[in-house]
């Protein structure tokens, strides 16, 4: 869908988004890569340039990194500059995931495209090992020209996907409707770049052109403000220690973060109206019976 937003309106929109950043933990301090993360595979495909980390994909391998800790509730953010030029067939991912078959997962997947065509951002939510909740949108800027922040806010009421502090998706807690919600499995934070030309670009019709390799994604501004969960602590104990009580209060349990503010709701409506290109909730060919959460989600 083409956006009708003019440049002055877009600038005003961005300034408004920044003014609301603190409401979603937007004042987080960033850390060096090695304070929070570590390479998880293809160590020779990492390049460090001061505060910037670069991961590359070539016809030998992609690369990936993971957080040193696991977390239950809070906010994670990274600034990414995506692969420039012809990125068809490539996927750069930033996500949170727990372990095991019945895992929970929140995904940003950036689907590359041919030169001049926009990146697609695919988000997905897995709960107890069940995904198939894809949404796709294009962005209101070129994500290959500069760094932009991508964040996940997670509390007991909602999961919010954000781009430059603008919400692009909300997955609400609907347990009162009998719909499971991810709230008891600590998650690691991950990113990777890999070849997915069997599906990533135009349904797999456009393949990766290896003559343009290496494909490089750049990272900076690593930030995690969340409840870290020691591996030796039981899941029920983690859920208790990461939830607010009379003795302790966590910022992510603030009543103002139990749902989007009015302004943030308007932002999300704008994103969906101007940039959403696919929503599993409306894909009746794939889901003849509407998924249960789609009947109740307001966004």
From Swiss-Prot:
It catalyses: breaks a beta-(1->4) bond in the backbone of a xyloglucan and transfers the xyloglucanyl segment on to O-4 of the non-reducing terminal glucose residue of an acceptor, which can be a xyloglucan or an oligosaccharide of xyloglucan. GO terms for cellular component: apoplast. SUPFAM superfamilies: Concanavalin A-like lectins/glucanases (SSF49899). Contains at least one intrachain disulfide bond essential for its enzymatic activity. It is found in: Secreted, Cell wall; Secreted, Extracellular space, Apoplast. Residues 1-25 form the signal peptide. One of its GO terms (molecular function) is xyloglucan:xyloglucosyl transferase activity. Its EC number is 2.4.1.207. Disulfide bonds join 227-242, 281-294. Residues 26-219 form the GH16 domain. Its main location: secreted. Xyloglucan binds at residues 109, 122-124, 132-134, 198-199, 203, 286. The record marks 107 as: Important for catalytic activity. Catalyzes xyloglucan endotransglycosylation (XET). Cleaves and religates xyloglucan polymers. Does not catalyze xyloglucan endohydrolysis (XEH). Probably involved in cell wall restructuring during postharvest fruit softening. This is Xyloglucan endotransglucosylase protein 6. It comes from Diospyros kaki (Kaki persimmon).
